[in-house]
């Protein structure tokens, strides 16, 4: 077969592992019960009680009752034999009793009618309650469609159409960025991770989906070199792509802990102060979570020129903002590329896009090109705000005046004994620089920076403020504002493309979109 779709249900992880693919898929015990017949139960709609995590539906004149418990029991594959087919696990009455009692509170008739069937079987779930769909980064033309999270029947029709179009046309007929199998980084596919995280995710199915909700299990797997230092300074961390990032900083004796609400949450006043500090003076945020790739060799320019819609053939020391497009002109990646010298580049992308961008880079590699994922080798500090130059000039001999250190340029400089790559860029629309620091030197450089910033009240800034600052400026974020279904013209980014620079992927589609306006 030219193309293969893996639809192996809870066996998909084991099947995929045989060919070197790790899927964050894990089975848990999943219960339902069926009552005795109810004469009055005909043509009733499905009902869900989200407060209790229970669903009710008619089943041939009887009522089927299922639930998604917060204390789900994981089910390792050792419990599921090779000939396991429509089989069952023993029923733990003590485990399910609270759910049965809750169901009877909603429908007292259940207690009067009685239970005819108790069922307990394995069902597969994912680490974030979203499907695993699409082409795998490891093997060309190998697709997966699994991780239905007990929603397989509801999703079947739509998924069938999406995959039929995908196989025939080469791309999906709907926007499925959230469910892209490439969203999970390597640390999110280990056995220890899925055994810890997925039972919690199952219990979140019917829970209130609070803004900025953070899971509790399988945390602190990838950390910035500054993690402990920032924790001591009040950081409240959130996890994206398996990486712990400081989202906001507690002050004035407050606890660095989320209190969830659909109104302004408890961190709003702290975040607002961070936002204003960047606009009015200077702030520093740890963006070490960003993906960082080194591309080198005599073919490195050809590789990046083929992928990028912007012109990457710039002088060493220039930094280019660009997109990587698909053949339809859709935006597959939104990133920056710094040219260090004639044959070496840094590619900087977001943590949530790390795996898909790394895959896209290596699948389009030209001869005589070497790539390295250096994401964990370098920490990154972004110093932003009108006073950023004053602070940074204290700790480096580099001349930071406009005429000497222009926007969109970078160079290697020293801060103390540490050589760092320093580039003048801003994702928040202020004067600022990004400092790429060897991980081993990160704490020392950070403390030096803080001392230099005392005069200007240098403020620790979290990712919540970074997001609102970039929104205020109108900067795009891949996966939220733009994705593979959007072209440059629709996104207001047509000025980035330089079609005269070379035959980049998506060039013809871009020119057609530009002509249409």
What residue ranges belong to the model's regions?
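C-terminal catalytic lobe of FAD-dependent flavoproteins
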Residues: 51, 60, 82-83, 87-223
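Mid-domain catalytic core of redox enzymes
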Residues: 33-74, 91-94, 105
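Glycine/proline-enriched, intrinsically flexible loops and inter-domain linkers
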Residues: 174, 178-517
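Buried hydrophobic packing segments
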Residues: 12, 159-167, 304, 449
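Central helical "cap/lid" subdomain
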Residues: 2-43, 174, 442, 459-460
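Short Gly/Pro-enriched turn/cap motifs at secondary-structure boundaries
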Residues: 23-27, 44-48, 54, 114, ...
């Amino acid at each position: 077969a030219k193309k293969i779709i893996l639809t192996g249900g809870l066996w998909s992880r084991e099947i995929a592992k045989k060919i070197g693919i790790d899927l964050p898929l894990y089975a848990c015990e999943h219960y339902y019960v069926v009552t005795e017949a109810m004469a009055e139960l005909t043509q009733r709609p499905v009902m869900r009680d989200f407060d209790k995590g229970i669903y009710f539906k008619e089943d041939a004149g009887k009522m089927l009752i299922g639930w998604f418990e917060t204390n789900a029991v994981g089910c390792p594959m050792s419990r599921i034999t090779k000939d396991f087919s429509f089989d069952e696990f023993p029923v733990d009455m003590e485990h399910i009793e609270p759910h049965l009692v809750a169901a009877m509170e909603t429908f007292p008739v259940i207690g009067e009618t009685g239970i005819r069937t108790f069922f307990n079987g394995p069902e597969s779930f994912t680490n974030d309650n979203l499907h695993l769909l699409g082409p795998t980064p490891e093997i060309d033309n190998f697709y997966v469609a699994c991780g239905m999270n007990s929603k397989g029947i509801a999703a079947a029709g739509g998924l069938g159409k999406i995959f039929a179009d995908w196989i025939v046309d080469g791309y999906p007929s709907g926007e499925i960025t959230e469910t892209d199998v490439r969203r999970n980084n390597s640390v999110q596919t280990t056995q220890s991770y899925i055994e810890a995280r997925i039972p919690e995710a199952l219990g979140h199915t019917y829970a209130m989906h609070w803004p900025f909700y953070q899971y509790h299990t399988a945390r602190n797997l990838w950390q910035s070199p500054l993690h402990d230092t920032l924790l001591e300074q009040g950081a409240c961390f959130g996890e994206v792509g398996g990486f712990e990032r400081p989202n906001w900083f507690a002050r004035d004796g407050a606890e660095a802990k989320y209190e969830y609400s659909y109104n302004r949450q408890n961190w709003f006043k702290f975040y607002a102060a961070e936002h204003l500090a960047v606009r009015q003076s200077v702030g520093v945020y740890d963006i070490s979570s960003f993906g960082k790739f080194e591309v080198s060799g005599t073919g490195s320019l050809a590789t990046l020129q083929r992928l990028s819609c912007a012109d990457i053939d710039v002088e060493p020391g220039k930094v280019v903002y660009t997109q990587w497009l698909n053949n339809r002109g859709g935006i597959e990646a939104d990133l920056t590329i710094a040219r260090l010298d004639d044959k070496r580049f840094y590619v900087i992308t977001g943590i949530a896009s790390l795996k898909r961008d790394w895959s896209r880079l290596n699948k389009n590699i030209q001869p005589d090109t070497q790539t390295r994922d250096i994401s964990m080798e370098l920490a990154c500090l972004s110093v932003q705000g009108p006073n950023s130059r004053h602070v940074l000039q204290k700790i480096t001999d580099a001349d930071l005046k406009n005429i000497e250190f222009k926007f969109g340029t970078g160079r290697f400089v020293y801060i103390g004994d540490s050589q760092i790559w320093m580039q003048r860029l801003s994702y928040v629309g202020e004067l600022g620089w990004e400092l790429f620091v060897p991980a081993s030197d990160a704490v020392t450089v950070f403390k030096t920076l803080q001392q230099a910033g005392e005069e200007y009240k240098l403020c620790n800034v979290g990712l919540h403020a970074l997001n609102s600052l970039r929104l205020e400026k109108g900067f795009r974020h891949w996966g939220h504002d733009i994705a593979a279904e959007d072209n440059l013209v629709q996104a207001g980014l047509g000025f980035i493309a330089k079609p005269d620079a070379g035959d980049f992927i998506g060039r013809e589609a871009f020119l057609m979109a530009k002509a249409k306006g």
